[in-house]
């Protein structure tokens, strides 16, 4: 993969999935159990491992899950008791939607190299839309062939819904139709 391609794929979800998948062993978690990391096939098991309330997508526009739900430690927060939960749909070569959520009172990654594209409301909470576009020979910010990140925070929980090669309206709908597990 070329350096240009690596720089272009700057989604926090890519880093979270790659690192988590490489180091996470399958884990089992029961309600009330200590926080754990791993890959999970159900939202209920992932929520038990994460130790905080999760939200799951209700609409993925036909994009298939690219793996399991990944729960890992939030390294940026500096505490082993904070978790980040990641899931992706589609492929990063064609179209994709992804969701990360953490309980670290902020993002668990550095994804701010982009252009601010506006402010929206997700479940009544102000969210900032960012795009990897409009500078350094990147596509125009009006193109759908760009990476978009929609970020918002509710209390100590931080959310990032992201997309590649999807219309803004789809990313906004993806985020606004999240439902509590």
PLM-predicted stretches and their roles:
Residues 27-29, 127-128, 175-181:
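Long alpha-helical scaffolds
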Residues 155-181:
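Surface-exposed amphipathic alpha-helical segments
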Residues 5, 24, 149-151, 162, ...:
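Primarily hydrophobic membrane-targeting regions of prokaryotic envelope proteins
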Residues 6-9, 65, 180:
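Positively charged, low-complexity intrinsically disordered regions
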Residues 4, 22, 88, 98, ...:
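Serine/proline-rich low-complexity intrinsically disordered segments, especially terminal tails, linkers
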Residues 32-155:
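Short, solvent-exposed recognition patches
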Residues 1-31:
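Secretory targeting and sorting signals
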């Amino acid at each position: 993969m070329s350096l240009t391609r690596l720089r272009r794929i700057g989604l926090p979800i890519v880093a979270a999935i790659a690192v988590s998948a490489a180091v996470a062993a399958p884990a089992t978690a029961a309600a009330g159990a200590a926080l754990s990391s791993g890959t999970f096939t159900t939202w209920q098991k992932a929520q038990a491992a994460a130790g905080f309330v999760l939200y799951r997508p209700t609409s993925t526009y036909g994009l298939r899950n690219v793996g399991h739900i990944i729960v890992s430690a939030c390294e940026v927060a500096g505490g082993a008791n904070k978790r980040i939960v990641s899931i992706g749909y589609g492929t990063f070569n064609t179209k994709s939607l992804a969701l990360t959520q953490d309980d670290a009172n902020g993002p668990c990654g550095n994804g701010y190299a982009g252009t601010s594209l506006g402010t929206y409301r997700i479940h009544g909470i102000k969210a900032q839309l960012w795009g990897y576009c409009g500078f350094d020979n990147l596509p125009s910010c009006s193109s759908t062939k760009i990476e978009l990140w929609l970020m918002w925070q509710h209390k100590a929980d931080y959310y990032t819904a992201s997309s590649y090669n999807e219309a803004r309206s789809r990313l906004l709908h993806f985020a606004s139709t999240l439902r509590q597990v």
